[in-house]
Amino acid sequence: MTIRSAVRALLAASLVIGAATAAAQDKPKAKKDSTKVKAPKDSTRTKGDAAKVPKLWASAAPLELTLKANLKMLRRDKKANSPYHTASFTYTDADGKPQEVPLRVKTHGIWRLAHCANPPLRLNFSNKLAKGTVFHDAERPKMVTPCDNDKDSEQYVLQEFQLYRIYQLITPMSHRARLIRITFADSATGKADAPKYAFLFEDPEVMAVRLGGTLVKQKGAGPDDLNPDVAAIAYLFEYMIGNTDFSFWGLHNGELVGLPTGDNLPVAYDFDFSGAVNTHYATVDPQLPIKRVRQRLWRGYCNENASVPAAIETFRAQKSAIYALYSDDIGKLLSPSIVKETLEYWDEFYKKLERSKDFLDSCEGKN
């Protein structure tokens, strides 16, 4: 089986399964192969071997960790190309044994790097030193932490993590993520912060390899450069969560995975400016025809509209599973008021799907 036929198989399976389980919906017919996109034969495969899913992503259970580093030096790094610092993770493994894993860590990001007391972090593990631990084969995950040291910031992180979980339910063409409960310990002073929830998500280049391609670093991809089926799912997800702070053209909060076939698969990430999270610091681009972050705006290209009905069936099929995320052990970490508001926001989205033409008319690229 070629890479092209394999990638197509995974995408088609996702859409067909979604359609088959959607209540009172007809099973959509398979589209002709006009998109030329194929899914990887094995979505857990890494380059050169058939490795299993790394331990870090194989479990959904929150992971208790302590990060020991020179926190003062680390947190004062506010430049785009900050240096790595030596650090270590300690945790208790499944057998109850304490584990310590050395790593390198540095700050990264744009808005959160400049404005947050706790900037996002990029982690870098040595596979040799991480062998036998939960971080073996994790490579270079990113860490999203509460922006400030307050309860609202921690709730924002939990809300954003839920969106990564939803995206993974919808499509494997998304970042894997894992919730953590982390304690930051300063190696210089011996002092430790209060533990807080954060999450790790898959490195973009690692994700691209998993999907059978490479990360596209050249900006400027237009509507004809994106696979329309995958783009329809990505844009519908952004519409669902009320996110307008992204651009696949500009590679801003959106990535492209380039396949050997020439196809480009858009993948969304970074959702703290979305209406679903509704952070106090989120704003709307004044050039857009909306005033509040909770307002939804369709930002897809018009040439992808034909692929939207199949994408809608996938979202409908996952509705129960999506709602269930807010009553499981992780969902219960959210405040009841946030759960109520979020489910009402999803209710509104699913009602809009009944009249998709209303929002598709605002597509970009009309003649």
Residue ranges, per PLM feature:
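Bacterial N-terminal signal peptides
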Residues: 9-18
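Phosphate/dinucleotide-binding and metal-coordinating scaffold of catalytic cores
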Residues: 25-367
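Sec/Tat signal peptide C-region and signal peptidase I cleavage site
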Residues: 20-24
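Bacterial N-terminal signal peptides that target proteins for export
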Residues: 1-10
